Amino acid sequence: MNAPLTPIVVQYLYVHEPEEGFYYPTARAGRSAAQVAQRYLECALAQVASLAYREIPCDLILAMNVTDRSVLGRAGTDLLAKIEELGATVLPTPYTHRPKPGTEIYVSSRYVLDAIMTSTEGIDPGRQVWLTDLDCVWADPARVFASAPPAPEIGCVFIDYPPDWDTVGFEAHGRTRNGIGELAAAMGAAGGAPPWVGGELLTGTAGPLRELVAACEELDAQLAAGDKTLPNEEQILSLAGAVGRIHFADLSAVARRITTGPRSHAAHVTGFEQIGLWHLPAEKGLSLRRTAQQVRRGHTRRLRRDLSDPARTAKRFNVGDTGPLRRLRDDGWIAAQRIRSITPRPAGG
């Protein structure tokens, strides 16, 4: 009997060109392309650690467009080296599925389409590929891997936005679930408010994933013929599902976007023990960064202990109850990062 094929976990990071315009709405993002890349490499390292330190049987890939690592600065280069040291392969991936020229918000969001193409090239057609946002933590990898839908379905996370909730904030079309439904109806589909496909997780085997990219390309061409555009990946993925080109399977029972911390007006998180993949966008400058710093410095004893215990894992990443002292520490951490963000840095830092 053949042994099951090892899954592939793919993260992807587009590093902006030095003169490229981009916008991130948070102070923690930094002022330069190198600083933005460093913040996201911290997330990537934390995610790799959440798998590598448990010796989870999977292959780890980080798709990147960088060929000259010096553009990452010293800190970024060190982070990337540590990611490789933990067993991840850096996969050169040019960005060819960009939004229209001039887009500065969500400019990198469609990079997942290129990561699909490079990570699935030449692999066994039966291997399951898991593409995740960088700011994710694998709390229960086995639970997530066991949820893989049968081919040709594509696993994802449906986000339960209200039908008229504007998730994009610019451009004229497809900004809401109803807006995606209107575009789908114009293409001959039933219309209505289709599910919104989140970008934090996509999973499938090579053939269906590559068909997903082809479907997005064809839909982009149809939209462009009518002088319409969808700037981010969640919009075009949702449209692909709405018109019936791709059948998406909702994995929100095992993977979810979790809002953390009072600064994000987060509600108390319940049922996190059943969620195997946590998407933690509010933790970029907090627990994910602290974890990356510990890995980078070799101070991993507590991290390994935390990852071996679900309750400790939840506390580390601010998913479980943390108490007022932890919140006070987080507030101090944020203040320190904001001060640092306006302090001049040495060249190459």
Give the role of each language-model region:
Residues 182-283:
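Catalytic core and acceptor-binding pocket of nucleotide-sugar-dependent glycosyltransferases
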Residues 155-183:
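A short, conserved beta-to-alpha structural element at the edge of catalytic cores
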Residues 264-349:
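Long, low-complexity C-terminal extensions of enzymes
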Residues 95-102, 163-164, 255-259:
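A short acidic, often aromatic-flanked loop/helix-cap motif at beta-alpha or helix-coil junctions
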Residues 103-112:
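A short, glycine-/small-residue-rich helix N-cap motif at loop->alpha-helix starts
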Residues 9-10, 61-63, 90-92, 128-133, ...:
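A structural signal for short, well-ordered beta-strand segments and their strand-loop junctions
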Residues 1-100, 124-125, 314-349:
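N-terminal anchoring/stem segment of glycosyltransferases
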